[in-house]
Structure formats: structure tokens, C-alpha cells
Amino acid sequence: MRCPSLARLPNRALSGLTRSPVRLQSQNFLYQRCASTAALRSPIAGPAYQSVFHRHNLQRRNASAATTAAVLEAAASNPDGLSQEAIIDNLDPAEAIRLSRLRNIGIAAHIDSGKTTCTERVLFYTGRIKAIHEVRGRDNVGAKMDSMDLEREKGITIQSAATFCDWIKKGDDGKEEKYHINLIDTPGHIDFTIEVERALRVLDGAVMILCAVSGVQSQTITVDRQMRRYNVPRISFVNKMDRMGANPFKAVEQINTKLKIPAAAVQVPIGAEDEFEGVVDLIRMKSIYNDGPNGETVVVKDEIPEKVKSVVEERRRMLIETLADVDDEIAELFLEETEPTEQQLKAAIRRATIGLKFTPVFMGSALANKSVQPMLDGVIDYLPNPSEVENLALDRKRDEASVKLVPYNSQPFVGLAFKLEESNFGQLTYIRVYQGTLRKGANVFNARNNKKVKVPRIVRMHSNEMEEVSEIGAGEICAVFGVDCASGDTFTDGQLGYTMTSMFVPEPVISLSIKPKNSKDSANFSKAMARFQREDPTFRVSYNAESEETLISGMGELHLDIYIERMRREYRVDCVTGPPQVAYRETIGNRVEFDHLLKKQSGGPGEYARVVGWMEPTGKLEDNKFEEQIVGGSISEKFLFACEKGFNLACEKGPLIGHKVLGTKMVINDGATHMTDSSEMSFKNATQQAFRKAFMESNPSVLEPMMKIAVTAPGEFQGDVISLLNKRNATINDTETGVDEFTVYADCSLNGMFGFSTHLRAATQGKGEFTMEFSHYEKAQPQLQKELIQKYLKAQADRHKK
């Protein structure tokens, strides 16, 4: 074992990290040494030597406990001074081996890039499943990770699915080593982006899949942004090398230019399209082929085919040059004009990948069962194990100061619930264990509400199947039954006041009214609504008191359609829906000053509150701001708190069309109170009234959501597609033309995109596809604003007539 990196630990923690010579030797070695010495002695001396072993073992345990305690103190008191190397170096040897053989990875990509097909091959080659089945359920079985009937019918992944498998990798010395992989397959469609968000929040690494024909696509850019948000290292896999028009090096170039990540191929394909045979490994300089009915046999040859030798030499040179830009050791060798060894290249790629400076690019075809196993080797070689990733929590006992989580089983337990699912046995909660051990029957505490819950069952998930286990260690992913919580909740064993940041949840952009067709289905309807909200943070349910309608909101038409269909299938509730409604927003126009007095007297205690100040735009169409600039205490602290509450309530429902307010700032700098009639309610109401009056005097505007759109279709339909976008007042930003197809990138209002998929299919003979995601809010056209305001005023008038 290497010497612990004590120099990297803060001084205050060093006292507990004194190296013991016993710690450097394994228990087995000590036992063998004592036993072998005892064999030369008389039998009477045996117990004495046995006691020596126990004494050494006790010393080792005590030293290990002291080291662990010191690391924990350093993690809490000075997380910036505690390096991951120090955490790794001071791991218990058995723990170090376990974590070094563990990978938590996700597979993410643009829709239809082959994520689920690739995952199916991974499960087959690791022995997790016995036969390969295809997406869309064409063989009446369907891919293992698409367990929902809807997924198999539509050929898309709707929910992220977790599994685990073991990959046996041959080391450089020819020895086989078993690695444990926790794998999450994610959806590619933007409507289900929350599934990607919560998967990447808890994973240590990812495989980003690209199509060899299309390269970097719109959703690839979204996935890249999500990976950056959570600092997830990735390797890239250029899939579909057997497709017509495959050009893997275009994909490599686009990773560099579009995603702005230094990338280089670590493989060169042998042939392409229908002549794709295998790949050349640029690090080992060997050819790799697949043999057998399903490509299960990997054949490695020393000979590199003559037809690709020049490309191999050029791409290896480019790999070394790219690494020299991101890794100091390779840079030194490059300047010295020294050829790096295989081990030096691998180490550099690993360092740069984990450091988020580089992504190695692999190539293959999952559908053709070619070159998937080398990609799995890349997962092991270049993606981090849990001990190599920095994970932080907030200590609520110390004003939410940052603390570093240490993946030792011996530490107090900390875990994050990242996904909820309803099953036949109750709520299933997916948990990533960051620190300590989660045991069956143990009590854990929810950091959000400090509620104690018992863990009755722990399981490992394999898509929709499960295996029961008694405990889960640090760095692992599992699911538990019977734990009532929300997605994003932190659990601890009660010793620590830690909480972790949840995943990013985007705001819904589309709504529609919904009700059950038959009133007798109301109970099941309510049950379904409650479940779907609990499972999916981007699916919202609200009740509009004015129209007396239930509204569901989500990320797009497909998102809501899927839930309506699930309600029909899973709860046998047929629903009636209204037309889609856009999530408009309102914003202030100009700065407006206000001086508002609320004064009521009706026999009993009255109401009195005066608020003075101004409202103005914040400068960005984002969050609202409330400030108090009271001098002299004209309004007390508790009444100012009520003012802020009134401001926030007013922003929830704007005066213009009844939608949320954005980009508005309110400042209160004076006011007055009454000795007996002033109350928190008075100031809350006064602030709301002042807000509405000032807002309407400011020349306010209605904002509409703008969407980023990418439309891909065969080249002969380019004119029709652009005409279609122009009719919707879309702003075309860029056009890319490929061999057989083109892609148009545009911005368009969500209001203009309703029904677009139907018109696109008609214009392209069913061959076009598009993706869209929320971009930003901007002012709606004056005519649309006028129509929306008139509609709102009419609805208000009709309501008052009732």
C-alpha cells in the first residue's frame, strides 16, 4: 500500500493520522508470518505467537480508527484542505480494493442515438441477461431496460432505469479482474429531462453516445450542459458505425467545436458503413474484432490492416498532441520528443478525464454487436471510482458550511434519495450512499423534516426486477421500501446535521385542463395525480379556482400525453382534456413609486398599514427581488417580513392576466403603523394592494416562453421545413447540411409550436423529426398581449356575475 498523503491533510487533523508500521501490512500477511514462525517452534509456543498476531491486529484497528476519525474531522473543518488523494490513501485496504473495483455510470445521449440498444449489449456481455432483445419490442420481449409497455410500443425511454452488472477485464499483465458497475439508462427526449438530471446528480461518470452520422445533435448539447452542471466526467462512444454516411471523425471534431471539450479518438474504425469490421486501439496499437453469433468473443490481433495504417498513425499523433495540451506529464514527453508508453497514455487519459479536461472517444455499433466491450474497458480505465470524486454536503449545525463526504463504510451514514417509484409493494426510493453503511432494519433521519424512519427492506434494482440485500456500503446505489420522503431528500443516521443539494428541476412550460370522463373515477384520478407528482418533480398539478378546473403542467405535449395514457392504462381512468395552455409570465415596465395606506375600521380590531417605496425592473427576466431600506424603525421587523410575504404572494398571480410575475423588484423605504390596529395581516394585504396598483401603472408586459428547436429531415425537404418554421414566426439561427440530411436550429414561441409535429410529418413524408427545449422568456407580440388581457378580463367579469 502507498504511504498515506499526510501532507495533504490540514494540520489540525494530523495528530490522528500518525502512520503505524502495522497498517502497511495486511492481516493475512501478519497471520502467515506468525504462523510460519510458529511452525519452527514447539507447539507450546503457538498461542504466544497467536497473541502476537491479535496484538498486531488490534494495533492495526486502533490506528485505522484514529486515521478515520482524523479524516472525518478534516472533512468537516477544512474540506478545501482535504484532497481526494488523502482520502484514498487513508482508506482501509479492503475498502480501497472494493471502491477501486466500483463504477457508477449513466448512459446519456440525443434521442435515437442507441442508448438502450447499447445498454442491452452491456448487460448481455457482462452476463446480466442471457439473450439480446431489441428496442420497440419487435421480438415481443423488448429491451430489458425499457420495462414499461409504453416504452416498448413507442421505442423511446420514458423513465431512467437502474441495473448492476459485473465486468471481467483483463489487466495489462493478463490477469482477470472483476469490476462492479451500477448503470443507469436515461431517456433521450427533452420532455423527460428530469430523469437525466437526477441520474447525473448521483453518478460518478457517464458514457455520452453520439450517432456516427449525425454527430453532436441538439439534445447532445443539453446532456453536455447537464453533465457540466454536476461535474460528471465522461467518455464518448460514437455509435452506429455500420450506418450509411457514418463519419466518426466529424463527431470527434464537433465534440471539440460545439461542446468545447478537448476530445480525441482512442480508436480508429476498420472500415465503415456495411464494411465496418472492428477498431484499432490507438493506445495498445492492436486491432480488435468481435466474433460469435452476438459478438460475444473479442479477438485481439497485433497486425493493423494496411488500409488504415496511415489514419492510425495520424490519429495517434493527434491523440498525443491533444493530451499534451491538457496533461503536464505528456506535455513534458512531447517537448522532449519522447514517445509515451501505453501505461503513460492510459494514466494521462484517466487524469484528464476525471479532471474534466478531456473526453476519450470510442467507436462501434451496438446494433451490429461490434466494439462494445472495448468501450466497457474504457469505463473501467478512464472513469472514476467513488473515492476519486469530490462530494460535498452542507452542515446545518455550522450555518450550512461545506463539508466533504468521505466514502468510508465506517463513517456516519449519509445518502441522497434521487428517484421515487410506486411499486406493488409500496413506494420504492432510490438512494445513493455517499458515506457510511445503510443496513436493513436501521433507523435513518430525513434531514428535511428530521423525521426518523426505519428501513424495512433494501434491494438492488435490475430494471423492474430486484434483489434483496442486507446492507449497502459507501459509494453504492440501492433502493429501499417503506421510506416516506420526497425526491432530493437527504438521509443520515442522526449523528450529523448534514444535508445535500438536490438536482436541478426545470420549470414546466405547458399546461392543460383535465378531468375524469366519469365522476365515479374521481378517487383513482386523485390517486394517480398524487403519485405522478411525487415521482416526477416536473409534473405539476394545480387547481384554478376561477375556472374551477384542474390543470396539469409539464415539459411538453409528449410529457403530458404519456401521463394521460398511463392514467388510462394503470388506473383505468379515461380523461377529458382541454387545449394546451402556455405558461405565460408578466413583468413590470417602468419604475413606479407608491405610497399606499390600508385603513379599515368595522367595530372590532381594525386594519392599519402604510407602505411607501417603489417598484422597478430587476434588469433580467428571472427571479423577483424584495428589499427593505427602512431607516428609523417606522416599520418593525415582523411587519417587514409580512410585507415580503405579501410581495411573494402577489408575484404568484400577476394583475395583468393572472400568471406569475418575473423580473420585478420591490423596495419599501418608509411606512407607518398603528398601536392597536396594525398586524402582520394588515401589512401583507397592504403590500399586495400596493403591488397591484403600481404594477398596472408601470406599463407592464406579458411574456411568453421561447423554445430552442432543432429540426432534422432529408435534404430534399429543406425548403418545406424552413417555410413551415417561417409560418410560425420562428427565428432561424443556423443550418447544417450533411450528406443526406440537414438540421435547422431556430427559436420559436411555444404558442407557435402546437401541432408542429403533425405538420412536419406531412411536409417530410414522415421522415422529419424535431426536438425543442425551453430557452427563455421574452415579450409577446402586442396583438397576442391584447387578446390575453381581454380574455382574462372577460373571465373575471363572468366570474363576478355568478
Swiss-Prot record:
Highest taxon, organism lineage: Eukaryota
Pathway: Protein biosynthesis; polypeptide chain elongation
Biological process terms in GO annotation: mitochondrial translational elongation
Record-linked Pfam families: EFG_C (PF00679), EFG_III (PF14492), EFG_IV (PF03764), GTP_EFTU (PF00009), GTP_EFTU_D2 (PF03144)
Feature: transit peptide: 1-24
Positions of the tr-type G domain: 100-387
Entry keywords, A to Z: Elongation factor, GTP-binding, Mitochondrion, Nucleotide-binding, Protein biosynthesis, Transit peptide
Binding site for GTP: 109-116, 185-189, 239-242
Cited SMART domains: EFG_C, EFG_IV
GO terms for cellular component: mitochondrion
Classification via HAMAP family: EF_G_EF_2_B
Protein purpose: Mitochondrial GTPase that catalyzes the GTP-dependent ribosomal translocation step during translation elongation. During this step, the ribosome changes from the pre-translocational (PRE) to the post-translocational (POST) state as the newly formed A-site-bound peptidyl-tRNA and P-site-bound deacylated tRNA move to the P and E sites, respectively. Catalyzes the coordinated movement of the two tRNA molecules, the mRNA and conformational changes in the ribosome.
Similarity comment: family membership: Belongs to the TRAFAC class translation factor GTPase superfamily. Classic translation factor GTPase family. EF-G/EF-2 subfamily.
Protein name listed in UniProt: Elongation factor G, mitochondrial
Gene: mef1
